């Protein structure tokens, strides 16, 4: 048996664990009689029982042991819970530490506070059942499983003094995101970063099935962890005293290994990738709960997952619950007033050393603004609209290079992407930093190193999870990805947006840096990769979330992209989605005009318009390729109908299309009508799926006259122009749409339609013969 714990300390830690377990069960079951000062009655029990018991005792056990480690070694540590359905445990521990009452003074540290604590859990207008933003010390709700370890590593990057204890549920370990997250240790630099201590909580069962990792041999499991690059330390048992001693010894060993790895790297330099420790904790699911209910085994089975005892119409169940609660001996844990006994409370760390009060778990408290160069200095010089071509993301890459350079000292900015930084033309950043890499490096490798700040791994899950963990602990970042494949993290985006929305209502949660997406290699320039790479639907997905959280930008050129990116990097508590092309495209606005345009969100391009306030048609566009096609259509219309009056409206901030009552960026009705008129036809060329524009504008006065072209799920490996043709977004179709909708041109519709189909036939014959677009497309340029 380990001599890490004296018998007295072990007894006190066991009592602390009992207290956390008691509070956890009380939250799930009780609405009254919190100290069992009366015999338990049916009216003391909640009418609806919600919560998850099975994982909770293991989480509570680990919490008290980590507290011992923090106190004895003066550690800076946070606690990430993969199985976040163990929410009552984390609420219980933050209450025992006092931080819960500090955040919520009504939840006093006495009998009344206990009753409120119990009653509010999973109660209408109370607190959620998981480790939600309302829980002090949480940066990871753990409702949707799979992201704990990625968040933990994200939190550890650039936090050299921080240790992140990450509890990985054995059910969670079956998810794809978690399975690849073990590889994060190939990106953690012990000289510069903090440490992650993964603890695999092997309690054996999910909701109704065994877990895979619990049903393979110990040798196979430890070999798996060693294959991932960890040194596993196994703790197992179902006798509390033995487990207390074994777990204390395991944690001491793990800490010693972490400190030795860091000391070697920080004094001798990084010479090789270390083998970091991890712990496998095998204890029964629902440990310390009822052994059996109605003759069926509960503890150590899947039946312990949620609410082990239900149906309290049976008086025997009330008695069984009381026996369970009294097994924790609450009279030994709380005084007559319901206060946690001082000799037990003294086991917890104090102040910011408490995991539930650590400022890293409320990252806005630590957030420092980025040092940003003046983005105007990176502008594409332009003598007139359409006078030059440029790669928008390459211009952005030069700007990001200097953002990276100017924040090297503060170490609070990283760029994330799934092996696409160079492909997306952002490789300018590699002039000032490497791609982070702790695995082997060969002669053919370029810009890999242990001190890099560009995070590339071919897992969108890891990129997203790392970035979220980095942001939630008070830093800044940007995630660059191919547009079609960002859908891989649709659900992760959901969870982060929900987190931000919840935080808006929690006064003590300080704002964090926004999560910034740059989607490029987009649908209209994936002609070379084909249909699988063509999907602009992430825009729709983002727009579903709360208007207080989401922003969507479609800059039409490089200078607008620079303005938008600067704005997004300065923003707080949003998810900013930027969609921009990487291929050479015509540039439209000089930097001053771009700033004005982006500030407005949408505007009339007077240099492309000739309506004198009374247009025949409004040609609207959002997105770089739709903008090109719209302007080309304008030229065609002027050729076809010399006296036509056209207004060109470009939208860069998609959310301005909504009314101001629906989104803070929304245009009021008067301003919207000034742009789009109240009664004239609007032909809207949109980057994404066309129905989104209808959805955003359906309450507008002129909605009936808005006709939208966009992606309609047609694509292949073809030419760039054929992509827009396949989806009826090409200039010829847009021009025909305008003619069909202008009443005074009704007599030209038939001839215009014939001309359109003749052009389409010529286009198809040409690309079939030459494998490239027609010269009039390739060589087109704007002429006023």
UniProtKB/Swiss-Prot annotation:
Alphabetical UniProt keywords: Lyase, Thiamine pyrophosphate
SUPFAM superfamilies named in the record: Thiamin diphosphate-binding fold (THDP-binding)
Domain of life: Bacteria
GO molecular function: aldehyde-lyase activity
Record has ATP-binding as a keyword: no
Enzyme Commission code: 4.1.2.-
PROSITE patterns: PHOSPHOKETOLASE_1, PHOSPHOKETOLASE_2
Keyword Glycosyltransferase: no
Biological process, per Gene Ontology: carbohydrate metabolic process
Entries under NCBIfam families matching the protein: PRK05261.1-1, PRK05261.1-2, PRK05261.1-4, PRK05261.1-6
Family from the record: Belongs to the XFP family.
HAMAP family documented for this protein: Phosphoketolase
Protein name: Probable phosphoketolase
